[in-house]
């Protein structure tokens, strides 16, 4: 049975557009860490579809799911004005050569996908080759979404803080670190020039502990690429709130399906310095 929500009235942000949106986009993680049945997808779209802009089949999960399910899920998404994107899988197809990649693009088009994501870090190909793949996707009639990850040199991570993958910014910054960020942005700019529609940024290491770390890196990425052309993966609720508090409702975010409602509450409310999550008080389930 679908869930229905009655929302409190927030002060609307006049700049936030209706779907289809070019900014303030919310892309939802599909099957990956957990299985999303058609019934669950239907409930999400019926109850919160107006807040969901995109659905992504993460981690190449679309290669393991029956094509009949994929087609039905994509059709369901399209009925609610939701675009559908592939996840990290195109780079695996490239191991079989350029012809296999062309076949992959055509298969994605036949299944109904709107966007193909290219993980630039996993591809490990020359920049010109990456740009050629972007053009192949565009020539196939689909949207191209290159993904870049902000990485750090291990030598830049203090040994005492390496436990559990935590990261503390070293002082002073190394020149290699700065060059890597500039290189990432330059590659992303060239992808946009080649026709890419959106640049996905995996910046967990930068902003997972953002209150004490490198918010300036995110600002540099947005400043160079533009807020409309960038999308950030927000892996948890605190990170979602961090982005909205600093960049407002128009920042594009990729989140888990469980964060959709909380994210929309945050987008629809003006936030102060002492803002706390409004999820517990922003809606009623009945």
Swiss-Prot record:
Coiled coil: none
Induction: Accumulates after heat shock (HS). Enhanced translation during recovery after heat treatment mediated by CLPB1 in a positive feedback loop.
Claim: Transport is one of the keywords in the record: no
Stored InterPro entries: Aldolase_TIM, ComA_synth, ComA_synth_sf
Identification of the protein by name: Protein HEAT-STRESS-ASSOCIATED 32
Function comment: Transactivator required, together with HSP101, for long-term acquired thermotolerance (LAT) maintenance, probably by regulating heat-inducible genes expression, thus being a cellular component of thermomemory.
SUPFAM superfamilies for the chain: (2r)-phospho-3-sulfolactate synthase ComA (SSF102110)
Description of the deletion phenotype: Normal growth and development under nonstress conditions. Compromised acquired thermotolerance following a long recovery period (> 24 h) after acclimation heat shock (HS) treatment, but normal when challenged within a short recovery period. Reduced expression of several highly heat-inducible genes. Slight increased in sensitivity to HS without acclimation. Faster degradation of HSP101.
Species per Swiss-Prot/TrEMBL record: Arabidopsis thaliana (Mouse-ear cress)
Keywords: Stress response
Disulfide topology: none
Protein family membership: Belongs to the phosphosulfolactate synthase family.
UniProt record, GO biological process: heat acclimation; post-transcriptional regulation of gene expression; response to heat
């Amino acid at each position: 049975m679908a869930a229905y929500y009655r929302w409190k009235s927030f002060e609307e942000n006049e700049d936030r557009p209706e779907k289809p949106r070019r900014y303030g986009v919310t892309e939802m993680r599909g099957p990956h860490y957990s299985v999303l049945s058609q019934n669950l997808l239907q409930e999400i779209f019926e109850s919160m579809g107006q807040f969901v802009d995109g659905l992504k089949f993460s981690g190449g999960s679309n290669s393991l799911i029956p094509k009949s399910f994929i087609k039905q899920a994509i059709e369901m998404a399209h009925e609610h004005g939701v675009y559908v994107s592939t996840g990290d899988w195109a780079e695996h197809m490239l191991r079989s050569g350029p012809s296999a990649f062309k076949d992959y693009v055509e298969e994605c088009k036949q299944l109904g996908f709107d966007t193909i994501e290219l993980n630039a870090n996993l591809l490990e190909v020359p920049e010109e080759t990456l740009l050629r793949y972007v053009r192949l996707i565009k020539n196939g009639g689909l949207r191209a979404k290159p993904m870049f990850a902000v990485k750090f040199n291990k030598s830049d991570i203090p040994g005492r803080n390496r436990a559990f993958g935590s990261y503390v910014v070293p002082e002073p910054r190394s020149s290699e670190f700065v060059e890597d960020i500039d290189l990432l942005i330059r590659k992303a700019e060239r992808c946009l020039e080649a026709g890419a529609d959106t640049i996905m940024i995996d910046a967990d290491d930068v902003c997972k502990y953002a209150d004490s770390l490198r918010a300036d890196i995110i600002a540099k990425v947005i400043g160079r690429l533009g807020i409309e052309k960038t999308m950030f993966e927000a892996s948890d609720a605190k990170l979602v709130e961090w982005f909205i508090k600093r960049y407002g409702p128009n920042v594009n975010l990729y989140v888990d399906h469980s964060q959709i409602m909380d994210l929309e509450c945050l987008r629809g409310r003006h936030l102060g310095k002492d803002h706390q999550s409004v999820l517990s008080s922003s809606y009623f389930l009945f």
